[in-house]
Amino acid sequence: MERHALTLKTLGHPERLRILALLSRGELTVSELVQILNLSQPRVTQYIKSLETAGIIERLKEGSWVFSRIKRGNAAISALVATTLATLPPHDPILEADLRRLEDVRAERSIAADAFFANVANDSGTLGDEYIPKANIESMLRKMAGKGPFDYMIDLGTGTGRMLEVFADRVTRGSGIDNNVHMLKVARHKLAENNYNHIRVRQGDLNSTPLESGLADLVTLHQVLHYLDDPQSAIIEAERLLMPHGILLIADFEAHNQDEFRSDYAHRRLGFDDKDIDNWLSSAGLKLSRVETIKTHSTRPNVKIWLGQPALNSQSKKAKS
């Protein structure tokens, strides 16, 4: 009872509601919230602490950045938060202005990321070669996927199409989705050069692809999640695309604190731990079936590969639909 009372009391404040509405769109740092809300940093920090004390949000430290996000796990509090968000006025001018500024913040990030990827595309294949044993990672991905053959593969955030090449001999058809035209230009050239006529790439938002549900028996997210504002959204989209007995392979860096990955490589997130991935998979109706770690060179963070599959209840729903 006391916890419910504290939650309701904390939610009964307009500025904290603004923060909650923004965090419902994804994780944000204090500096980003300050920029969006036009409030002082001490005030924003105070509101965040109140929301954290009430069990509504949690903070995640990565390197020198600290992200705030809505906390999951307590069903009662989550229900109160969901109800509160659902009852917020949809056309409130203050909330609408906040969302516009949120899009501005994301657009700034996107411009910087696009410039980075344009440079990567012009020098294709060099990113991370000195840090990560790509051959070992690709070999493990093939091993975890199994021999197939797969009817339809979808690679979300395909970049230069490397994952499509890796699985080209095991798929009947393949599609790669990416927003960056420079990367897709390289991908098309490489696929054509290798006569992979059964594989295509197209421009699109990996969080909301133009593809039908339940198409793929193999979906990959290779070194993609660390660039995203909302990694869970990509996993939800991957689940939508999966057949009832399909598999999702996620490859990304293990959680680390090397801030230069943000400045040098435009990473939004500094890797992930098993708990993060497991929670996101579970929320999307998937189960974490296997985890492998690939050791990297020198002091650089290791790469992990997570295999997700539709949970039993999710398989049943997909089969009926």
Question: Which residues fall in each region the model found?
Answer:
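N-terminal helix-turn-helix DNA-binding core of bacterial DNA-binding proteins
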Residues: 2-43, 66-73, 142
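Amphipathic alpha-helical dimerization/coiled-coil segments
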Residues: 76-125
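Conserved alpha-helix/loop element of class I SAM-dependent methyltransferases that forms part
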Residues: 132-151
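Class I SAM-dependent methyltransferase SAM/SAH-binding core
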Residues: 152-154, 160-208
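A short acidic, Gly/Pro-enriched loop at the edge of an enzyme's catalytic core
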Residues: 207-219
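A short SAM/SAH-binding and catalytic strip from SAM-dependent methyltransferases
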Residues: 217-230
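A short glycine-rich, Lys/Arg-flanked "PGG" loop and its adjoining helix->strand segment in the class I
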Residues: 232-247
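C-terminal alpha-helical "lid/dimerization" subdomain adjacent to the S-adenosyl-L-methionine
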Residues: 247-302, 306-307
